[in-house]
Amino acid sequence: MFCVQCEQTIRTPAGNGCSYAQGMCGKTAETSDLQDLLIAALQGLSAWAVKAREYGIINHDVDNFAPRSFFSTLTNVNFDSPRIVGYAREAIALREALKAQCLSVDANAHCDNPMADLQLVSDDLGELQRQAAEFTPNKDKAAIGENILGLRLLCLYGLKGAAAYMEHAHVLGQYDNDIYAQYHKIMAWLGTWPADMNALLECAMEIGQMNFKVMSILDAGETTKYGHPTPTQVNVKATEGKCILISGHDLKDLYNLLEQTEGTGVNVYTHGEMLPAHGYPELRKFKHLVGNYGSGWQNQQVEFARFPGPIVMTSNCIIDPTVGSYDDRIWTRSIVGWPGVSHLEGDDFGPVIAQAQQMAGFPYSEIPHLITVGFGRQTLLGAADTLIDLVSREKLRHIFLVGGCDGARGERNYFTDFATSVPDDCLILTLACGKYRFNKLEFGDIEGLPRLVDAGQCNDAYSAIILAVTLAEKLGCGVNDLPLSLVLSWFEQKAIVILLTLLSLGVKNIVTGPTAPGFFTPDLLAVLNEKFGLRSVTTVEEDMKQLLSA
């Protein structure tokens, strides 16, 4: 086992990365190794997808499957070894079908990629785990050095984050052939074990640029189906009655669940990154979508244990449900998996609803506590002139984007302290689950404009980018000249690709933490600092002083 993709990874003087029987996330060495094998199979599939496009062949089954199954290897998504192997077998079957299509056009068609002809050696998980050793990401570290390995992983993990957003967009009916062609090209190239530093840096920026397009079609998918988010108050306390909790990012799953629970007497609560769903008109129209439950994903083992109903996980983040003894009432969807947990194959939530009706639910309604969400792209752009007016009248000094992933490290209190230290004449724009560090606090307003503005899920960084570009255009300056600072928390691969997206668009002087990714070497950090001004957090006082004086 070697895995260094998330913030929790083991860090020692000898090196970084989980490399024992179990990773810090709870992933076993077996599952981790089999995920490496799956990635190799997917690289071979992408190699043939690139070749097929040379013949004008576009196989939508391949395009749909490839990023979805890659998403299953993201942190806290799928811990189920047999399902990971199943994805690998499906990847090889699709590859062979695609290869046959190519050969039907050109009898001499071939693919030079080292992963292009990968076959699984056995049905036995132990044998497959031994085979996976050929594909462990650090297998040639001694030959290439830590810097090249770090850049490879930056590209691999960044592409994994983009694949997750591609799947979210695909579920909503969005498809862009250029994006998929670019994805396959990059995935196939990474399967050649590249070792050129400049080429890898260019690839990282290409992934960021591609992801901006992915976020654009994801935004289109969400707003076309569910309307543009508008500011909406959400209750974060319990309402009397039977209940279901839904977590993750998949708004379509939430919509289906709301449709199927309507009139059943079962209330639905959002959790984690589902919180922004309350801002969408076509979702909040369901009156039994009664509120948001819980806090950051890392607290779920305590909070889920207390929830008096079933829980549905639609994407990341799931952690060991046996710890809180709620494994008999947590359900996984799509690419999510945990051994022994019930999995919903289709869109029928009937078994979950039946379980909810058999449980007690909340015995009484608590005194409501309302927070506001729903500052989506359209709302933000509508406020652009107001922001400019406030800046021109010196009523608004600075905007801080404080957001990103949450996590369990104590150092993450930095983001709570930072938000509460923001001066009263400054605005906080937030997104993703890092907001749970401070989104239930009171921040007041500036002439009626809330000082805390919740822009949505992690992918809604797209809305923040569009707002920044619009403000810069209206003010006749560059984005980096705006009174705007980005203070970002990272945990996993979606955050990595958001960072690459921002860097690829030329956004500079981003502050990130609480720690640097374990695959960032000192040399790589120095390059990113020199080129983009990227740096790690220090203290709230020092960072605030520096950002306000920039």
From Swiss-Prot:
Report the GO terms under cellular component: cytoplasm
Q: Which family does it belong to?
A: Belongs to the HCP family.
**Modification type Cysteine persulfide: residues:** 405
- What does this protein's record comment on cofactor binding? Binds 1 [2Fe-2S] cluster.
Which top-rank group of organisms is this from? Bacteria
Entry binding sites for hybrid [4Fe-2O-2S] cluster: 249, 273, 317, 405, 433, 458, 492, 494
The reply to whether RNA-binding figures as a keyword in the UniProt entry is no
What are the UniProt keywords, alphabetically? 2Fe-2S, Cytoplasm, Iron, Iron-sulfur, Metal-binding, Oxidoreductase
Q: What is this protein called?
A: Hydroxylamine reductase
Pfam families, per the entry = Prismane
Function in brief = Catalyzes the reduction of hydroxylamine to form NH(3) and H(2)O.
Q: InterPro entries given for it?
A: HCP/CODH (IPR004137), Hydroxylam_reduct (IPR010048), Prismane-like_a/b-sand (IPR016099), Prismane-like_sf (IPR011254), Prismane_a-bundle (IPR016100)
CC cofactor = [2Fe-2S] cluster; hybrid [4Fe-2O-2S] cluster
Q: Where in the cell is it found?
A: Cytoplasm
Gene3D superfamilies given for it? Answer: 1.20.1270.20, 3.40.50.2030
What EC number(s) does the entry state? 1.7.99.1
What does the record give as the reaction this protein catalyses? A + NH4(+) + H2O = hydroxylamine + AH2 + H(+)
- State the Gene Ontology BP annotations: response to hydrogen peroxide
Q: Which organism is it from?
A: Salmonella gallinarum (strain 287/91 / NCTC 13346)
Binding of [2Fe-2S] cluster, residues = 3, 6, 18, 25
